[in-house]
Amino acid sequence: AIDVVVISTPYHHHALASGAAMRAGKHVYCEKPLAHTVYEARLLQDVYNELRPGIATQMGTQIHATENYRRVVELVQGGAVGPVSEVHVWCSRTIPTVEVAILPEQPEPDSFHWDVWLGPAAARSYNEQYFQGGNLNWNRRWDFGNGVLGDMGSHLIDLPFWALDLRRPLTVESVGPEVDPVACPPWQVVTWEHAPRNGNPNLATPVKVVWYHGPEGMRQRSDLLQPLVGEDTKIDDWGIGAAFLGEKGVVVADYGKYVLSPAAQ
């Protein structure tokens, strides 16, 4: 008998596979991101709420289990930098240009089931350049992925969501280059506004979460954050990270380390 389904496919399969597994009464471990779109994620939440508590689920954000993330959560929730009003999160990765929307047909190998790989995506002829090179290739395309934010944001934004007990935002604003119907943006700055949370006084303030990726995103991040973190932290040395801006100081963290500014903290 099958008890658990592990889903580590390209992102456009995640919601369909997870939903089908839960409907079949199976527990689900799904790699990040949970879904291809926000709409799909909400559908999965509805399915889970209908079937709970008989189904156990987990998303593959393995860094959530590390000592460093747990320690940063303790510092923030314990008031080391005071109430936090802003968190700035970033990844220096960008999205290379997708020059051809629909690639020319190639012979499909006998060992490759192209229709299965396409799954719920729009039909097209086989071409290995759609997937060759792994997720850094197919994740460029809206049909199969959701770009740097969908890929890396799942890991990095997990930290402020956990530390600040965040839920669905009140507002969302995205700034970037002109929208490309085929390819995800090479750079992006996204702002979410969150309401205050009840309970812990260190969480009882509205929070703005800002995401940056790509060259222009990194420039805006550095211009804003370097004066705030001071000489204790050279923000350009952090290719990925999150900076919690509190009333009493700043904590900057990535997967494996954190620093407090001012250092006297």
Tell me the role of every PLM-derived stretch.
Residues 17, 40, 68, 156-159:
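Alpha-helical packing segments of well-folded alpha/beta enzyme cores
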Residues 70-71, 83, 88-92, 97-265:
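Contiguous beta-strand/loop segments that form the cofactor/metal-binding neighborhood of enzyme cores
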Residues 10-11, 15-64, 79:
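Beta-strand-loop-alpha-helix segment that lines the small-molecule cofactor/substrate pocket
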Residues 3-6:
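N-terminal Rossmann-like NAD(P) cofactor-binding module of classical short-chain dehydrogenase/reductase
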Residues 1, 63-66, 76, 160:
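N-terminal Rossmann-like dinucleotide-binding module
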Residues 8-9, 31-33, 60-62, 90-92, ...:
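Active-site-proximal beta-strand/loop segments in catalytic clefts of secreted hydrolases
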Residues 8, 44-47, 75-78, 90, ...:
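Structured segments of extracytoplasmic/periplasmic soluble domains
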